[in-house]
Amino acid sequence: MAGIVVRSESAVAVMGAGAWGTALAKVLIDAGGPEAGVVLWARRPDVAERINTTRCNRAYLPGTLLPPGIRATADPADALRGASTVLLGVPAQRMRANLERWGGLVADGATLVSLAKGIELGTLMRMSQVIVSVTGVDPAQVAVLSGPNLASEIAQCQPAATVIACSDLGRAVALQRMLSSGYFRPYTNSDVVGTEIGGVCKNVIALACGMAAGVGFGENTAATIITRGLAEIIRLGMALGAQVTTLAGLAGVGDLVATCTSPHSRNRSLGERLGRGEIMQSILHGMDGSDGGDGYVVEGVTSCASVLALASSYDVEMPLTDAVHRVCHKGLSVEKAMALLLGRSTKSE
């Protein structure tokens, strides 16, 4: 994609060296990069050290050689020093705790970009709301990046697009220019609510698609789940003030299709294992690093609870989300969940 490369004079901080944070650090450099470089914060010092010495993040994005211009650190003060743009790539349920620890390290006037897709348990806040609540920044300083963005594919420079949502168009355009490359195309949007809701809910629907595949159901079932899942997402989004066009775009349908159909999707993969009869706690034990591995988060497992609670507070019906929640947290079998969904009273589409 041809375009003008706009270089930022100050460094960009990417807080979170998981697969997505690492992939976006690479995108920033490939797009022309800030003159001061990209600083990638890793929670674990050994991960930061390996990135700096090998130019690879073997723990979370194996097989990808990171370009010069990315420097990793385990010191949040080091990462945030002088950064006018901060990409927040920590898990949704840890966003608040991390922001509280980082305290006054964020520069005044900095643009804060949420990469996390979740609703906070308890408060039922979206991530942009959590960021404003903890930091006290103007909501116009907060942007959300979301779309059909599987980190492993983007790290391989496969063509992809995303949405940058912010109420401040100037900030959105600045981020768009900063991230535009020959393989990564951002679109701007002012609908922060819709962009976030699409990103959160698609993880829950992807769990359902995985469950169906694990049981042995085919493409008709998958298409039904995706389509009816989209109906749930639109109902909740509209209740919260989202625009239907956002949910019909990259941050809605696009993200939903990618996550529900890709073998690289953590949420779909976990759902598939549940459909094959594996036990939730055993699966999570192998994913969270407690078995000695590097560990990663499957947001949909938590999101199904917070999304369901949020929907209930707005009197929005979400039967698929409810079924996923029952399987993940109430011990319902996938087969019984499917039977309950199919046994619901008939209605018009």
Swiss-Prot record:
Kind of enzyme, top EC level?
oxidoreductase
Per the UniProt entry, what are the Gene Ontology biological process annotations, in alphabetical order?
carbohydrate metabolic process; glycerol-3-phosphate biosynthetic process; glycerol-3-phosphate catabolic process; glycerophospholipid metabolic process; phospholipid biosynthetic process
Originating gene:
gpsA
Recorded family membership:
Belongs to the NAD-dependent glycerol-3-phosphate dehydrogenase family.
Q: In which pathway does it act?
A: Membrane lipid metabolism; glycerophospholipid metabolism
The catalytic activity, as recorded, is: sn-glycerol 3-phosphate + NAD(+) = dihydroxyacetone phosphate + NADH + H(+); sn-glycerol 3-phosphate + NADP(+) = dihydroxyacetone phosphate + NADPH + H(+)
Listed name of the protein? Glycerol-3-phosphate dehydrogenase [NAD(P)+]
- Segments forming a coiled coil: none
Residues involved in NADPH binding:
20, 43-44, 117, 151, 266, 297, 299
Please give the organism. Mycobacterium leprae (strain TN)
Taxonomy, superkingdom: Bacteria
**Which EC number applies?**
1.1.1.94
Q: Where in the cell is it found?
A: Cytoplasm
GO CC aspect terms: cytosol
Per UniProt, the keywords (alphabetical) are: Cytoplasm, Lipid biosynthesis, Lipid metabolism, NAD, NADP, Nucleotide-binding, Oxidoreductase, Phospholipid biosynthesis, Phospholipid metabolism
Report whether Oxidoreductase shows up as a keyword of the record: yes
Q: Where is the active site?
A: 202 (proton acceptor)
Which residues of the sequence carry a binding annotation for sn-glycerol 3-phosphate? Answer: 117, 147, 202, 255, 265-267
The GO terms this record gives for MF are: glycerol-3-phosphate dehydrogenase [NAD(P)+] activity; NAD binding
